[in-house]
Amino acid sequence: MIKIKKGLNLPIAGRPEQVIYDGPVITEVALLGEEYAGMRPSMKVKEGDAVKKGQVLFEDKKNPGVVFTAPVSGKIAAIHRGEKRVLQSVVIAVEGNDEIEFERYAPEALANLSGEEVRRNLIQSGLWTALRTRPFSKIPAVDAEPFAIFVNAMDTNPLAADPVVVIKEAAEDFRRGLLVLSRLTERKIHVCKAAGADVPSENAANIETHEFGGPHPAGLSGTHIHFIEPVGANKTVWTINYQDVIAIGRLFATGRLNTERVIALGGSQVNKPRLLRTVLGAKVSQITAGELVDADNRVISGSVLNGAITQGAHDYLGRYHNQISVIEEGRSKELFGWVAPQPDKYSITRTTLGHFLKNKLFKFTTAVNGGDRAMVPIGTYERVMPLDILPTLLLRDLIVGDTDSAQALGCLELDEEDLALCSFVCPGKYEYGPLLRKVLETIEKEG
């Protein structure tokens, strides 16, 4: 087992009950274009078109052959675009049960599949988009080969679902999915799970299981990659989430695209935090209807540390998100708040009484408790960064855009989620995720 000591389990109220309930009926789903870094769509449908589940909606011009398929059947209700016609979302009004069928295989045939058969079925069904590269966190090219594939079967994000609960319901599909992935490449398939977690595996020669323990970010793929198979400019690995492995197993067994998602609905503003069964890309406001405390709330697709605000054209569950988090908007200001002991506020430093209340769960808000200021290196980044890098120096380079130094300090190993805790504890109130993305884009473009 690999146990990390540095990190932080956020003591946030509203942790979900780890029991799966059926979610509400969803009448609108969407694919969010801005989730796919660098993607430029070539649209295959227009508003008003009827689509079947599994039908191609658009293809990536910059990554030919990578197609994005409809998670449900229905009609194209809207295609939202932002500045410079950047695709924001393709919205589908759910109607009927028409679907496209893909290749299916008998259980005993899965162990003998060729890599080309696996690749073709994943690409045609749209499940190829479940894979992401590291570095750069992009969908891999259809003819690319990884050094390894990392299956993330654990989640240490605040308010997250326990993967063991989800996998237990679909253990056979998860095993089949692992077997299919083992046929995609001869390289290692690293299955990463929590210490002692009951996660099934397969007896394929290239599948290895690893256990991780410790606080968040022990459950992030970036942490797993760093300790098992570090990447660089000339070494790329792929990552995939456990629920997508289940979907792959079901696709190859039945020939049908599985777009079901089990998500955690949690946070201090949720009346009954719990796990819900819904669909990929579901309209978030329909999921949360009647579920929230009547207040000024911020609804987030994903983790409170690194999720996306859901509103307008973005009011949909993200492709790579397994949770919806709800906290209160922190619009009020306190007069001389820094003087009070503040037992109801949490800080990683010893500046509030809440820091010393070890078993207390706090009602976090969106308030950052201060304005923008200079980066202050007081050791907070080192306390939450378990990777073998120099976080203060790296974060400084991200702020000033020094790509050469940032690359030398290990930025290619990282994704936005890997720096979310650094943003949370930053005295200067910097958001390091967008700064990292900007540097990665520059490195990819200019080398």
UniProtKB/Swiss-Prot annotation:
Catalytic reaction list: a ubiquinone + n Na(+)(in) + NADH + H(+) = a ubiquinol + n Na(+)(out) + NAD(+)
Cite the entry's keywords alphabetically. Answer: Ion transport, NAD, Sodium, Sodium transport, Translocase, Transport, Ubiquinone
| UniProt KW Ion transport keyword | yes
Which biological process terms from the Gene Ontology are attached to this UniProt entry? Answer: sodium ion transport
Q: What is its EC number?
A: 7.2.1.1
InterPro entries documented for this protein: NqrA (IPR008703), NQRA_2nd (IPR056148), NqrA_C_domain (IPR022615), NQRA_N (IPR056147)
Q: Is Iron-sulfur a UniProt keyword of this protein?
A: no
Coiled coil ranges: none
> Which is one GO molecular function term here?
oxidoreductase activity, acting on NAD(P)H, quinone or similar compound as acceptor
Family (UniProt): Belongs to the NqrA family.
Give the multimer and partner information: Composed of six subunits; NqrA, NqrB, NqrC, NqrD, NqrE and NqrF.
The record ties this protein, via HAMAP family, to: NqrA
Known role: NQR complex catalyzes the reduction of ubiquinone-1 to ubiquinol by two successive reactions, coupled with the transport of Na(+) ions from the cytoplasm to the periplasm. NqrA to NqrE are probably involved in the second step, the conversion of ubisemiquinone to ubiquinol.
- Enumerate the NCBIfam families for this protein: nqrA, PRK05352.1-2, PRK05352.1-4
Protein name, as recorded: Na(+)-translocating NADH-quinone reductase subunit A
